[in-house]
Amino acid sequence: MGKKITDTLAIQLFAFCDGDMALEAMSNDVIEEFERVEGTERMVKDPASQRLYKVLHATRGLDTGLELFLTKKGDLPTEMKNHHLRAYIARLSNPQSGTYSKLKSHLAQAAQDNIVIHRNRYVHKAGKFPDNNLINQLIPDIFAFYQLVLGL
């Protein structure tokens, strides 16, 4: 993810927040997480750890970004046990509020398969590190998925 893409997302997010200060604070957190993906190489020297941190920061940005979207649309799950990527994606494909378009089921499944499963594999499993090929696929997939969600 490059600076240009992050800057574009920042513009989209601030327009989406429409002056709501609480949502703008969340959007700052999302942007900071996405910016940390690029900054990881300056802060972390070990290449395997760099790749792991990229997965961590990109998915934290996505997680908070989906929470922001669902909050703005009045469709955030009420139970804390449902505040995670898998539940957010499920909610997007079955909106309760009717204030946004339904995420098509094949796109929800692709997000589960291409983002959530990889995140869980590497963030929750000791000794596992993604390779460069996965990073080169996963990070753009995360960014593209979030931009898609903002357009629902």
Predicted regions and their residues:
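Short, flexible helix-adjacent loops and helix caps
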Residues: 39-46, 70, 74, 127, ...
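Short runs of predominantly hydrophobic/aromatic residues within well-ordered alpha helices
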Residues: 54-58, 62, 85, 108, ...
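Short, hydrophobic, well-ordered secondary-structure elements
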Residues: 48-73
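Charge-enriched, short contiguous segments at helix-coil
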Residues: 98-152
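Charged alpha-helical initiation segments
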Residues: 1-51
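Histidine-centered active-site/metal-ligand motif
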Residues: 57, 81-83, 124-125
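Non-transmembrane, amphipathic alpha-helical segments
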Residues: 18, 22, 46-54, 103-107, ...
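Short, charged amphipathic alpha-helical segments flanked by flexible coils
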Residues: 71-106
